[in-house]
Amino acid sequence: MGFRINTNIGALNAHANSVVNARELDKSLSRLSSGLRINSAADDASGMAIADSLRSQAATLGQAINNGNDAIGILQTADKAMDEQLKILDTIKTKATQAAQDGQSLKTRTMLQADINRLMEELDNIANTTSFNGKQLLSGNFINQEFQIGASSNQTIKATIGATQSSKIGLTRFETGGRISSSGEVQFTLKNYNGIDDFQFQKVVISTSVGTGLGALAEEINKSADKTGVRATFTVETRGIAAVRAGTTSDTFAINGVTIGQVAYEDGDGNGALVAAINSVKDTTGVEASIDANGQLLLTSREGRGIKIDGNIGGGAFINADMKENYGRLSLVKNDGKDILISGSNLSSAGFGATQFISQASVSLRESKGRFDANIADAMGFGSANKGVVLGGYSSVSAYMSSAGSGFSSGSGYSVGSGKNYSTGFANAIAISAASQLSTVYNVSAGSGFSSGSTLSQFATMKTTAFGVKDETAGVTTLKGAMAVMDIAETATTNLDQIRADIGSVQNQLQVTINNITVTQVNVKAAESTIRDVDFAAESANFSKYNILAQSGSYAMSQANAVQQNVLKLLQ
């Protein structure tokens, strides 16, 4: 072998291998100390890019989970607030139910209305003060609010919370048809009751017979109320236009085909003869008589069949000729505030004919606090005895008074020129259905004694409230009002339940989304760990390998350097 001292090939090889081993040992120590397989781009450039992307995705998903939990917190806050509002509505409906019986006086009903007003104030207070991070939740401004729930932009869930103030909920539709003055067979159809389909009811006969009339029609409508959302009530009443005055019925006087005969009665039916005679056959006629608080004769059909008066009931009863055949008025209620669309055949016999006066109104919960104006009151069926019909056209007041059936014709004791006190006869009278029609009904001409500028005071002042529908007191202070508030409170409850149901659906959607992205986040982190994190078992083996090689490399270099000493032996 050759001996060279200028170039120690063995030492160079040992050094080169030692450098490689030292570098690998450093990498292994770095991995073991950091727990990461990739500590720099040089370790695995593509792996690092993938791992960084996965790390970003996992972090974004973590924030998306937080966003979803914030959204759930917002919706839960609104839901709990509405739960309290629902309890308030339950109390309002309970108080309205308490007021909906004639054992209550105006005083006690007014007390109940005061309670209801306070409850509504608290309901509105909840609606106006419920907030999250300064954001109003129940005021109607929380509309299409977005929550980012994904790793990429525009992966959102939208949430809307409807307004819950008393002015925004409880919107209930009331419709009352015109007074029905003719019998017939009615076929009633609700158009687009569910937004698409029509609902056709069975035909009903409107007459004075048992099992017919508006009572039968209302029963037919109410059988399907759960499906159509429309409920019906009826009022079949014939009321005198003035307090009863002494008079005598004819021998042929009959109601619904049952002859009652001649009855002599006193002012205000003081002897009870007229009421007693009519009620003696009420089980057969279905018509019950009474004298109301104003002293007027009131005939009521409890079961909803018509009231038909034959013969002469006497001028003192003040039953007009056009009221002697009366089949009442039908009232419809719908708990969503939308118009009730009706079609069918012979609708005039149900009060919903093309030429009949139909009162319509949509009323919110807040509106039930205040005074019901005339239009709303009539739509709800207030005082519906003689409304919805015009008495007829006459050239003058005198002409009307002289007409048969007016109660003021010759022989009644109130005829023209008798000098009787007409204002007494017309006190609290209802003459027409709408004040705007006054000029077409009473065309007062010069010379009648009641023309413009007249100073006569025998006739009661012609106020619109005397001749048409009138405003009604607030809320539950009347029986009809209490019934209406019950309907409105029920609608308000349905409205809040719908809003809560929508919120609940969004909460469930958010929860499912959170569950999904939580699993996704775990899987993404697992994938990142597989790429980025070190396998300690494998790396420990590598460390042992390079540690031993480093030690053996040092020994090899030591031996390679010692080989050069052999050259000195040649020189000795």
Curated annotation (Swiss-Prot):
Subcellular location field: Secreted; Bacterial flagellum
Family: Belongs to the bacterial flagellin family.
Keyword Secreted: yes
Gene3D superfamilies, sorted: 3.30.70.2120, f41 fragment of flagellin, N-terminal domain (1.20.1330.10), Flagellar export chaperone, C-terminal domain (6.10.10.10)
Gene: flaB
GO CC term, one of those recorded: extracellular region
Job description of the protein: Flagellin is the subunit protein which polymerizes to form the filaments of bacterial flagella.
One function term, GO molecular function aspect: structural molecule activity
Record protein name field: Flagellin B
Classification via PANTHER family: FLAGELLIN
Pfam families linked to this entry: Flagellin_C, Flagellin_IN, Flagellin_N
Subunit structure: Heteromer of flaA and flaB.
Provenance organism: Campylobacter jejuni subsp. jejuni serotype O:2 (strain ATCC 700819 / NCTC 11168)
Entries under InterPro entries matching the protein: Flagellin, Flagellin_C, Flagellin_C_sub2, Flagellin_hook_IN_motif, Flagellin_N
Principal location listed in the UniProt entry: secreted
Keywords, comma-separated and alphabetical: Bacterial flagellum, Secreted
